[in-house]
């Protein structure tokens, strides 16, 4: 089906339930939904995290996508659901399958019971039925839960997201800050298609006014396809640094990470992520413009936040912890 941008109809005024609304992408989605006149309700897992909202326009309900019994109160009178919860590494009592498959199934069931008319689901580019990559496989499983629900849906598969408070670009900034030679696993030629988190949030807000986007799965990227080497260079330029790269053999790093991830509670990178380095994380060029009618912002000139990363922050991230002042934006 050929999709083209259509004029926005202004305020939509729906009751929208957002999961993951206090997170990096979620805060931007909540803002985009409010700006378009929707009533926003957030499912909040950790009491207190709703403090990220400086306004009182957001209704808060406490619950967990892993606890179906906690969801019913949050979903009353909901007309649309935006499901954002996902993890990039397994945690205790929260495996990829727990969160991406079963958690999504629980949210879908609650949405269906509430009579929701649109389910907007953020997955990941590369999601597929290949069990070799647990992250991407469970993302695909989550998509199947949505598709099989009978609720009209829109699924987004974004490439890597950037924006203040992100993890990917901030970690690279930490490496640039700490190392005169920036370590790169493998050739660094693996491809990305960075998309601003603000722009994905805008796409989600626009979707609620678009009947033609129901039943669609959308791979989304920004204005430029880049290699990992290119991204490192762009981060270094944004920080006013000149850095050479030091390429580490993939097999050696795989063995090293296999040992350290058994020791560190939150390793900088996992063996699964190393194995996924060979997967191209790119979408069709111009997809955002064609479908949503606006040009996404480029990474260059829009990552000034990397200058907030200090040497101590870089060391902290190497040890597996994201500094609070970098993520709380």
Each language-model region and where it sits:
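N-terminal Rossmann NAD(P)H-binding glycine-rich loop of SDR-like oxidoreductase domains
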Residues: 3-6, 10-38
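Mid/C-terminal beta-alpha module of Rossmann-like enzyme folds, strongest
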Residues: 6-10, 207-269, 283-329
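Oxidoreductase cofactor-interface core, primarily capturing Rossmann-like NAD(P)-dependent enzymes
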Residues: 9, 129-239
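SDR active-site strand-loop-helix element
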Residues: 19, 43, 84-85, 119-125, ...
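Residues forming the Rossmann-fold NAD(P)(H) cofactor-binding site
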Residues: 26-27, 101, 140
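Conserved glycine-rich Rossmann-like NAD(P)H-binding loop of the short-chain dehydrogenase/reductase
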Residues: 38-47
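NAD(P)H-binding glycine-rich loop region in Rossmannoid oxidoreductase-like domains
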Residues: 48-106, 110-113, 125-129
